[in-house]
Amino acid sequence: MPFAWTKPALVATALMFGLSGAACGQKPDPAAVAANLEAGQAYLTKVSKEDGVQPLERGMYYKVLTPAADANAPKPTVRDTVKVHYEGKLIDGTVFDSSFERGSPAVFPLEGLVEAWRVAIPQMKKGETWELYVPSELGYGDKAAGPIPANSVLVFKIELIDIQP
């Protein structure tokens, strides 16, 4: 298929330019925006109390789903390029993007990704899989984008496969 790269390339572009810039000009319903914000805050409060969930900077939380096989496995820096498998979903379980579904991991320069990933991924060891809980202000904020409503908390499953300096 000559255009098999199209969807991964578009996803990479969206992540590179940042989630917050992807929804220019969309004006969601103010009541829905407020309800989403409230639901997201309640979700993060609930998740923060679950076993194994740890706090990160800026109101994010994470849970190690698969630890690194090597306790001394390297961690990337923001200047590195990372190879990851990931799935992004809403708090209701709706998947909005998945390299797992495409069957092909993504390779990104970390410094070009959204802030949530620039903060979280350097904390991961090569070989780990995390579930990352991202407050709306580190995602799309108060703007909707495609299937993602405004003020949505995002949940990412991220597997750090490789690090390239």
What are these regions (language model features)?
Residues 2-165:
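Cross-family detector of peptidyl-prolyl cis-trans isomerase
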